[in-house]
């Protein structure tokens, strides 16, 4: 299990764009399960939508991508690198995510060859499918400008 400080030591995302609160399970380089506690205070609810707050689907996908980044960047060989979101296939949204929901984020790395790879992401709330997708990634190094 990884807490928020440990997650922040692995991926560079920070508020308001850090969308993973905890990693519950992790198998290095293979898979992870994380959670996002969706609060009524999330900044995106101010505009999406004020009278009917719903978490934007693209942010659910981003939360899955961040869990995938933890899987990839936790390994010693990838420490300090960045995982870039390189593509998405077969994305489907099945249920809305609202304030008070706990989003369970499961990502399995399907293949990784060099700096390029693909993972499968599944997001659920209370055991019900919210989103499933395939995510492509590219690993890169931080540039010193």
UniProtKB/Swiss-Prot annotation:
Keywords per UniProt: Cytoplasm, Lipid A biosynthesis, Lipid biosynthesis, Lipid metabolism, Lyase
Active site per UniProt: 48
Annotated catalysed reactions: a (3R)-hydroxyacyl-[ACP] = a (2E)-enoyl-[ACP] + H2O
GO cellular component terms, semicolon-separated: cytoplasm; membrane
Annotated GO MF terms: (3R)-hydroxyacyl-[acyl-carrier-protein] dehydratase activity
Highest taxon in the source lineage: Bacteria
Catalytic EC class: lyase
Subcellular location: Cytoplasm
The enzyme's E.C. designation: 4.2.1.59
Any Pfam family: FabA
NCBIfam families for this protein: fabZ, PRK00006.1
Family note: Belongs to the thioester dehydratase family. FabZ subfamily.
Function (record text): Involved in unsaturated fatty acids biosynthesis. Catalyzes the dehydration of short chain beta-hydroxyacyl-ACPs and long chain saturated and unsaturated beta-hydroxyacyl-ACPs.
Descriptive protein name: 3-hydroxyacyl-[acyl-carrier-protein] dehydratase FabZ
Organism: Geobacillus kaustophilus (strain HTA426)
């Amino acid at each position: 299990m990884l807490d928020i400080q440990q997650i922040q030591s692995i991926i560079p995302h920070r508020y308001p764009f850090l969308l993973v609160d905890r990693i519950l399970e992790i198998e290095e380089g293979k898979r992870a399960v994380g959670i996002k506690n969706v609060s009524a205070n999330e900044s995106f609810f101010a505009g999406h939508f004020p009278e009917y707050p719903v978490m934007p689907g693209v942010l659910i996908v981003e939360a899955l991508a961040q869990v995938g980044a933890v899987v990839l960047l936790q390994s010693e060989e990838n420490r300090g690198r960045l995982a870039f979101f390189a593509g998405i296939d077969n994305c489907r949204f099945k249920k809305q995510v609202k304030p008070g929901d706990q989003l369970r984020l499961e990502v399995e790395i399907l293949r990784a060859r060099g700096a390029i790879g693909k993972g499968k992401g599944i997001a659920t709330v209370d055991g019900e499918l919210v989103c499933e997708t395939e995510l492509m990634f590219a690993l890169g190094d931080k540039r010193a400008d």
